[in-house]
């Protein structure tokens, strides 16, 4: 024959009742219908309880928060949790037989007035809601309107200031660009003469020779002769003055620096008229023959 739901087969083939465990304990494995002969008692796992003797397993504890109720007693291994009344703004429906549901549901405007708990909670909510006096409401509205007006006015003034600022800078930039274009156009139409574009080297050389003129070496009797070239005629950018076709040759003393400046100066305009001039080197000095003409008596 077959064993019952609380029996197992022993080693002699007989049906034996499963072991019973006390409160807070359960069998380590299911026992019944001929199986579970080697099961033993063990403690209930967390969130489960067993309040009586038997071979049945531990049961799950109830969670009061899930059913919207206040928890009065916590769950233990030997007892279930105890839930109290419904949470605020919740109520339990009453069945036809007078029994109430375990779960609480929210209170709404459609809740029957017979539910005392909902009526009490709604009255508490209405009592807790503060009423604002009409004068204070008017004052709040006025202050809010003024704040909005001031904010809009500030934004408008800021926008106008930014617009004027950008326009001023744009006009100034356009005027500067126009003047630069006009100057470039004038320079392209009226180029600067090459004679005015002097280099720094030529300017320095001219300054040197203008401040330190060369004195020609002439005989005393020749320097006093009328019609002969004087010292002013030799104050040039080189050791020689401009040559003229009606002058005769006469030696003038020049240094090597004078010849170097004379050969490299671009502003000297009489370089091509030297023609038959000759340079003689005697010792540590150089002599240049410059033609000049002695006027006839």
From Swiss-Prot:
Disordered: annotated segments: 272-297
Family matches, as Gene3D superfamilies: Tumor Necrosis Factor Receptor, subunit A, domain 2
Membrane-related topology note: Single-pass type III membrane protein
Gene Ontology cellular component list: plasma membrane
CDD domains: TNFRSF27 (cd15838)
Cytoplasmic side: 160-297
Signal peptide stretch: none
Residues with glycosylation annotation: 74
Gene Ontology annotations of biological process type: cytokine-mediated signaling pathway; ectodermal cell differentiation; epidermis development; intrinsic apoptotic signaling pathway by p53 class mediator; positive regulation of canonical NF-kappaB signal transduction; positive regulation of JNK cascade
Cystine residue pairs: 3-15, 18-31, 21-41, 44-58, 61-75, 64-83, 86-104, 107-118
Biased composition (Polar residues): 272-281
Bilayer-spanning residue ranges: 139-159
UniProt keyword annotation of Glycoprotein present: yes
Subunit (UniProt): Associates with TRAF1, TRAF3 and TRAF6.
Function of the molecule: Receptor for EDA isoform A2, but not for EDA isoform A1. Mediates the activation of the NF-kappa-B and JNK pathways. Activation seems to be mediated by binding to TRAF3 and TRAF6.
Protein name: Tumor necrosis factor receptor superfamily member 27
Native source organism of the sequence: Homo sapiens
Lineage: Eukaryota, Metazoa, Chordata, Craniata, Vertebrata
